[in-house]
Each structure stands twice: as structure tokens, then as C-alpha cells.
Regions:
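C-terminal alpha-helical interaction appendages
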Residues: 1-77
Length: 77
């Protein structure tokens, strides 16, 4: 189910990612949730929500990486 605000994100996202990364996750999740409504568009199996979570985490990892227990921007800023 789409997230309307960062406050609605799962704890594993909201409590660990910086605000900007949460925004990226939420926007990517919502877009993917809409796109993968049709099961024929899901290439790795699983449900619509699982597919959207995979896409959202991939989007976060394009801009952030985990350094120890913190997520930091790839560009160091």
C-alpha cells in the first residue's frame, strides 16, 4: 500500500535512513507499487509490495551506502 508520508514508512526504513533517503524510498516505492500492479510485470516473483520494496531499496542504494550502522550519501555530503 502506498505511503503518503515518511511517518508511514516501516520502522526499518524510518528509524535508520536519513530524511532524504526516506523520501527516495517512499517515492520509489509508490511509483513501483503503481507500476507492478499487474503480476505479469513482476520479474522476480513475489507480491506487489515485495516488488515495490526491492525497487525502493535499490533506489536508496543508488544515492546512499551503509557505513557501519549509518546510511551516508555516496558523494560524502
Amino acid at each position: 500500500m502506498p505511503y503518503h508520508s515518511n511517518r508511514e514508512l516501516p520502522d526499518r526504513v524510518r528509524l535508520h535512513l536519513p530524511i532524504h533517503a526516506q523520501d527516495i524510498f517512499r517515492e520509489a516505492f509508490n511509483h513501483a507499487y503503481e507500476r507492478y500492479g499487474d503480476p505479469r510485470k513482476r520479474h522476480f516473483g513475489g507480491g506487489r509490495e515485495a516488488a515495490a520494496h526491492r525497487v525502493a531499496w535499490a533506489a536508496v542504494k543508488r544515492s546512499y551506502h551503509k557505513d557501519g550502522d549509518r546510511w551516508v550519501p555516496l558523494n560524502g555530503g
